[in-house]
Amino acid sequence: MTIFAASVFDATVIFEDKELFKGRGAASVWAEKLAKEIESPVTVEKIGTGWALRGQVDGVDCTWGILGQRLKRIT
């Protein structure tokens, strides 16, 4: 099962129509899991009132949030 199929049961906030992690700690745990999945470094970044995951896939900068209890690329 990929990390993108795993349920995200952590607290979230909505900022500018994007669902983000409420806490940095939860975002950091998911950043570690995502980094293993995509085999590339992933960091957490404060966006408004929440935390998103940031990394690169195939040389393209990506940001991940949450949609329906799943990780989703938002940029």
Task: Label each region the model flagged.
Residues 13-26, 34, 67-68:
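A short, exposed loop/beta-hairpin motif centered on an aromatic-Gly-Thr core
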Residues 11, 19-21, 40-42, 54-55:
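Alpha-helical interaction segments
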Residues 1-16, 47-54, 60, 66-69:
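Short aromatic-glycine-(Arg/Gly/Cys) micro-motifs in beta-strand/loop hairpins
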Residues 27, 31, 42-44, 53, ...:
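Hydrophobic beta-strand residues in large extracellular and virion-surface proteins
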